[in-house]
Amino acid sequence: MCIRDRGGNDCSFKHKMARLILKVQVSNTDGFDDTAVLEFADYKLGGLVHEGTFDVKTGTAATAGSVVSDWMLRQCTGAPKTATDKCVATFDAATGVMTFTMILLPQTLANALVLEISPDDGEYQSYSNKDMIKPALEAGYSYTYTITVKKTGLTLSGSTIENWNDGGSHSGDAKM
């Protein structure tokens, strides 16, 4: 524990998990007239390990479980539809972009992640990517993928890998 009081040391922290951001959009020129079909779509992501350990002495986070093939990021049910989210999910109505942000255990993927999307367009079709998302999820790094849903499938239009931004240095006192 690090407490600044009576000449103590400042605390320093590092990200020990990885962040994965998926930005999903539709292509108006490739079959979708309404960008809102993503707001109440179902999203399933497969290929990640969700269980693990964290060693407080070494600061190491590691996976210790099996790959999950059917993690529902967002599931929409009912009339009117309501969404149940398993991660941070936001829909930007102005742009039609659905963004999922996940904090995950660092891991090297044996296979590419499989993202399956069932848009709310009344056609009851699912779209999935084919070996497009395969990051080595490294501690302290953020990975962003932009995925475009087309009537013919999904297209990965770009990815970025970056360090997390510095939130600045802050200090304070804790007194008993």
Q: Across the structure, where does each feature detected by a protein language model lie?
A:
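Extracytoplasmic cysteine-anchoring/structural motifs
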Residues: 4-176
